[in-house]
From Swiss-Prot:
This is Small ribosomal subunit protein bS6. GO terms for cellular component: cytoplasm; ribonucleoprotein complex; ribosome. GO terms for biological process: translation. The gene is rpsF. SUPFAM superfamilies: Ribosomal protein S6. PANTHER family: MITOCHONDRIAL 28S RIBOSOMAL PROTEIN S6, SMALL RIBOSOMAL SUBUNIT PROTEIN BS6M. It comes from the Bacteria. Binds together with bS18 to 16S ribosomal RNA. GO terms for molecular function: small ribosomal subunit rRNA binding; structural constituent of ribosome. Belongs to the bacterial ribosomal protein bS6 family. Pfam families: Ribosomal_S6 (PF01250). The keyword rRNA-binding applies.
């Protein structure tokens, strides 16, 4: 199983209940693809580098997941269908570079 970073930006105007609903949906979508969540960083509302739609802020969620195969397209396509999801980025973690010892 490979390790991936899943970064999401949600609508900044969501209530706490709506954010929890989105988190539950994301975790269900990840389980449907065969991925397991190993870490979740909830960064909350942050200012965006540029305007996305009409929003200058976004609600950031950063997941560390483990999945087999090549789940990037499956995960991203299922999450982009949500109305409150503004951006999705799935990146495969690379192992640490091995350096030669002198």
């Amino acid at each position: 199983m490979n390790q991936y970073d899943l970064n999401l930006i949600l609508n900044p105007n969501l209530s706490a209940e709506q954010v929890q609903i989105e988190k539950d949906y994301i975790e269900t979508a990840l389980k449907n693809v065969g991925a397991e969540v190993s870490n979740l960083d909830d960064l909350g509302n942050r200012r965006l580098a540029y305007q996305v739609g009409k929003d200058r802020e976004g609600y950031y969620l950063m997941y560390t997941i483990k999945a087999g195969g090549n789940p990037e397209k499956d995960i991203a396509s299922s999450l982009r269908l949500r109305d409150h999801v503004r951006r999705v980025l799935v990146v495969k973690d690379r192992p640490e570079w091995k350096t030669k010892k002198a």
